Amino acid sequence: MITIGIYLAERGLIPDVLLRLFIKRFSLSRLVEANNEEKKMSVIDGLKTGPIAENTIDANEQHYEVPADYFKAVLGPKLKYSCCWFDDESVSLGEAEIKMMESYLERAKIEDGQMILDLGCGWGSLSLFLAERFPNSAIYSVSNSNDQIEHIKNIAKEKNLENLHPEVQDVNSLNLNQQFDRVVSIEMFEHMRNYEALLQKVKHLLKPDGLLFIHIFCHKETAYLYEESGEKDWMTRNFFRGGIMPSHDIFSHFSEFEVKKTWKVNGTQYTRTLNEWLKIHDHSKQKIMSIFQNHYENPSIHFYRWRLFYIACSEFFSINNGKEWFVSHYLLSPKQ
């Protein structure tokens, strides 16, 4: 049944209202499976062994090596590929991108003149924002995607941002010679599988009084892995192989850092973000199909697959009025 539903959805043959109803019910059923304290602790224990990131090649192919032109066509003007902040109905996607990034400045206590590392920088929305806002700061941007780093370099060159230093690095072998006042990581830890090793690396990159700021999506209580075990694991198979759904309290289980402060961002903020991307995706169908024709054997399936991704995630974050799955911000300081 699930296989037939996915087959039809990836061809645009199921009305959105039915898709959303099915996805909401399916998400709630998966929550019942995952909501187990023993399983959660097993997942957290597993985040203390093995490679920092798994399936990095698959993850890049699924998300980050999708043509840059696609993200330029679908995301907001800053290309922020993560949750944005709509503080009222009139806020545009572009304004919401900036509002969320401004919240990082306040919460991470970022100031001009600091050395800042954007770890898992995506398409450079935050790195470019910081480099322009803080001309006396040095901003280092790290991603394992060649396309992303080339995009950031091109924009930095256009804007003459000499204080921005983007480079391709695999987090498993992360090697930087600098020490930083702030390390900022936006929606990267969800792709990591050894938090303990990664936090140890970050601790060595920070100055003694440095701070780590993290933005993740999470569940209010439980943690679980995205693993492909059957037909129902469409999200893992197509978008999130090697990923994890963290719990809100995830960072309290690791000894390298002290959690100084946490903030919850209601999941409906991500629902709105995803629905805005979906609107643009639909409005730009002709352009996107042209981009996909040069990249995929079956561009139509990929067009509808991305639609399904946005719809699925938007419903997911709306459950329980955005209080079941949501976004969390953390300010952490290294334990001495």
Could you say what each language-model-derived stretch is?
Residues 113-122:
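Conserved class I S-adenosyl-L-methionine
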Residues 218, 224-324, 334-336:
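Substrate-binding/catalytic lobe of Class I Rossmann-like enzymes that use SAM or dcSAM, i.e.
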Residues 196-211:
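A short glycine-rich, Lys/Arg-flanked "PGG" loop and its adjoining helix->strand segment in the class I
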Residues 158-172:
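Conserved SAM-binding strand-loop segment of SAM-dependent methyltransferases
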Residues 2-71:
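N-terminal auxiliary segments of SAM/dcSAM-dependent transferases
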Residues 123-135:
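Conserved SAM-binding loop of SAM-dependent methyltransferases across substrates and taxa
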Residues 44-55, 59-110:
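Class I SAM-dependent transferase core
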Residues 172-183:
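A short acidic, Gly/Pro-enriched loop at the edge of an enzyme's catalytic core
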